[in-house]
Amino acid sequence: MLTRKQLVALSEFRYQIARFQRFSVAASRAGGLTQTQYLMLLHIVGHPERDWATVGELAHRLQASPHGTAALVNRCIALRLVAKHRSIDDGRHVEVHLTERGRRA
């Protein structure tokens, strides 16, 4: 059983998630994006170590399948929001970078 303090903290946490969801919907609509496209761009620009991400990292952050994330990346490429580059360090990996248009979105 949760304590009162834990329940209050959980309630506040869920409230902040709901506020972020509302903000995300408004931000994605303002940019002409789907919410998932917006979140993917956010995860690329917000990567803690660099300004690009792999499809696997994006799938993990989005809590989506790698296959579904690859399809999302391809749709965003068609919209000129992102570009894929083969990794110089490891040719098996593909880096997903924001384009200028993706940065503006």
Question: Which residues does each PLM region occupy?
Answer:
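Canonical helix-turn-helix DNA-binding module
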Residues: 50-100
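Pre-recognition alpha-helix immediately N-terminal to the DNA-recognition helix
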Residues: 12, 19, 39-43, 104
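A ubiquitous short alpha-helical element
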Residues: 8-11, 97-102
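N-terminal leader segment of winged-helix/HTH proteins
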Residues: 1-31
